[in-house]
A protein has these predicted regions:
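Active-site beta->alpha loop and helix N-cap motifs at the rims of alpha/beta catalytic domains
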Residues: 40, 46, 51-154
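N-terminal glycine-rich anion-binding loops that anchor highly charged ligand groups
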Residues: 6-14, 36-53
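N-terminal small/glycine-rich loop or linker at the start of catalytic domains
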Residues: 2-24, 78-79, 109, 139-143
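N-terminal phosphate-binding or glycine-rich loops at protein starts, especially the Walker A/P-loop
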Residues: 14-37, 42
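N-terminal glycine-rich phosphate/pyrophosphate-binding loops that anchor nucleotide-derived ligands
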Residues: 2, 27, 55
Length: 154
């Protein structure tokens, strides 16, 4: 049985990032600020605020891109660590213009952690990008998807 009293387990609140699937990440700045204050009151320290998508044809709200310039306007409480999710396939897609999607060095960003949603088949191909982002000063999380049918050896 899993011992949930372990000190190294950290909660990552994904409410805004996950909720964005219902409204294209189009939350008002007022709503986001209120939400962040409530998260702080609840003593939650890690929040995945949104995605950092490549430019899309479809219009997305501010948390679909989670640009540094937008995050700075939110006055995020200092105790809260900000995470954004990226789709690994976006980095592996040769048709994307990566210049539109480069992360700043960590000390110029309010983002602390970048979580890569990665299919099992892509894990080896995404490693150079994980290293690149880590060199910029960010913490990196890999969300390994579609691995339930893999063997223990894989």
């Amino acid at each position: 049985m899993l011992n949930l009293k372990r000190k190294n387990i950290k909660l990552l609140d994904c409410t805004l990032r996950d909720g964005g699937y219902y409204n294209n990440w189009n939350f008002s700045k007022t709503f986001i600020k209120k939400y962040l204050l409530e998260i702080e009151k609840a003593n939650i320290r890690n929040i995945e605020i949104g995605f950092r998508f490549f430019k899309q044809k479809k219009k997305l709200g501010s948390l679909g891109y989670s640009k540094d310039s937008f995050l700075k306007k939110l006055n995020i409480p200092k105790k809260i660590n900000i995470c954004v999710m990226v789709n690994s396939e976006d980095f592996l897609n040769k048709t994307n213009n990566k210049k539109d999607h480069i992360f700043n060095i960590k000390n110029k960003s309010r983002i602390d952690t970048i979580r890569f949603a990665t299919h099992f088949r892509d894990i080896n191909n995404i490693i150079p990008y994980l290293k690149e982002v880590k060199k910029l000063g960010y913490k990196v999380i890999v969300n390994l998807m579609q691995c339930n049918d893999r063997s223990e050896n894989e």
